[in-house]
UniProtKB/Swiss-Prot annotation:
Biological source species: Ralstonia pickettii (strain 12J)
Role description: The RuvA-RuvB-RuvC complex processes Holliday junction (HJ) DNA during genetic recombination and DNA repair, while the RuvA-RuvB complex plays an important role in the rescue of blocked DNA replication forks via replication fork reversal (RFR). RuvA specifically binds to HJ cruciform DNA, conferring on it an open structure. The RuvB hexamer acts as an ATP-dependent pump, pulling dsDNA into and through the RuvAB complex. RuvB forms 2 homohexamers on either side of HJ DNA bound by 1 or 2 RuvA tetramers; 4 subunits per hexamer contact DNA at a time.
Head domain (RuvB-H): annotated span: 269-357
UniProt cross-references to Pfam families, sorted A to Z: AAA_lid_4, RuvB_C, RuvB_N
Name of this chain's protein: Holliday junction branch migration complex subunit RuvB
Residues that bind Mg(2+): 80
Region described as Small ATPAse domain (RuvB-S): 196-266
Broad EC category: hydrolase
Chain positions recorded as ATP binding sites: 34-35, 76, 79-81, 142-144, 185, 195, 232
GO cellular component assignments: cytoplasm; Holliday junction resolvase complex
Compartment annotation: Cytoplasm
Enzyme Commission identifier(s): 3.6.4.-
């Protein structure tokens, strides 16, 4: 039952235009076409870019493999893009896989033994590696060696294979789920942060050029403001706004055109969609601002509990519109203000409102 709820939550997330997860293989192909190829083309993440630039330059000067890199942060911020940039900047090949795909030690061994000197192996969702596969990875990361078993039963024996020096780039949205032994083997650990509207506007402008779409600065900024700090969402919204501009306007994406297109898509000024507003309005109007238990809230809006916890709540909490308390969910003063409602007269939200004044 729990697994079914998780699958339902993932399906709901994929359907939302403001979801940070890739919606389809077609969208993944679209992302690849817009992906920057070099570090100089990569917008945002200034600290991470600066660190990688120094570490890669030093490794190239010594003709060594770059130290192993762990990239973590919310989905859609550019972890896969950075892995490709690292390989291109280092002038080596990139092999890409993901944690769930590597089911057996032999799957990983086949990848490792086919790597050439200083190549990059990119493992997405590395937190989902199985324990038996992870055990094989430890000596590979430390000593560039793996132990494989040949034969079965009493005749089985362990054979040590030497590997070419390589760089593992691991990406995860859940760094806390990595085991300590695996985390400790990464020499470079970088957290990707949400983007500012100004940074996203630069990304939207760059993507518009690649799509041969005409956009003005105000139009790019309007899209950026509603993209929840995530380049993947910004590029997805840009595609839909471009369609609107070509059909309903003169093909030029102005602030007014972007606003009309995003209103048609039910994406409001802070990046909320219908589901976000439905959740907040239920707490505000049906439960007087809260607190309300998660099961009551799920019943009130007709969604699964996992959908609320995994898909809807994280962004609302992060942006300060919702709080989780021991007694249940509580709408904050920002939620009241967003919907043009007056200050609550009493209760836990009253204190939050007073704190914001």
């Amino acid at each position: 039952m729990i697994e079914t709820d998780k699958l339902a939550a993932k399906a709901v997330s994929a359907e939302r235009i403001i979801s940070a997860s890739p919606a389809s293989p077609n969208e993944e192909a679209f992302e690849r076409a817009l992906r920057p190829k070099l570090l100089d083309e990569y917008v945002g993440q200034e600290k991470v870019r600066g660190q990688l630039d120094i570490f890669m330059t030093a490794a190239k000067n010594r003709s060594e493999a770059l130290d192993h890199v762990l990239l973590f942060g919310p989905p859609g911020l550019g972890k896969t893009t950075l892995a490709h940039i690292i390989a291109r900047e280092m002038g080596v090949n990139l092999r890409q896989t993901s944690g769930p795909v590597l089911e057996r030690p032999g799957d990983l061994a086949a990848l490792l033994t086919n790597l050439e000197a200083n190549d990059v192996l990119f493992i997405d969702e590395i937190h989902r590696l199985s324990p038996v596969v992870e055990e094989i990875l430890y000596p590979a990361l430390e000593d560039y060696q793996i132990d494989i078993m040949i034969g079965e039963g009493p005749a089985a024996r362990s054979v040590k294979l030497d590997l070419q020096p390589f760089t593992l780039v691991g990406a995860t949205t859940r760094a806390g789920m990595l085991t300590n032994p695996l985390r400790d083997r990464f020499g470079i650990v970088a957290r990707l942060e949400f983007y500012t509207p100004a940074e996203l506007a630069k990304i939207v402008t760059r993507s518009s050029g690649l799509l041969n779409a005409h956009i003005v600065d105000e139009g790019a900024l309007e899209i950026a403001k509603r993209s929840r700090g995530t380049p993947r969402i910004a590029n997805r919204l840009l595609r839909r706004v471009r369609d609107f501009a070509e059909v309903k306007a003169d093909g030029i994406i102005t602030r007014e055109v972007a606003d009309a297109a995003l209103a048609m898509l039910d994406v409001d000024a802070v990046g909320f969609d219908l589901m976000d507003r439905k959740l907040l309005e239920a707490i505000l109007h049906k439960f007087n601002g809260g607190p309300v238990g998660i099961d009551n809230l799920a019943a009130a809006i007709g969604e699964e509990r996992d959908t609320i916890e995994d898909v809807l709540e994280p962004y609302l909490i992060q942006q300060g519109y919702l709080q989780r308390t021991p007694r249940g969910r509580v709408a904050t003063a920002s939620a009241y203000q967003h919907f043009g409602l007056g200050a609550p007269k009493s209760g836990p939200v009253r204190d939050l409102w007073d704190d914001n004044q």
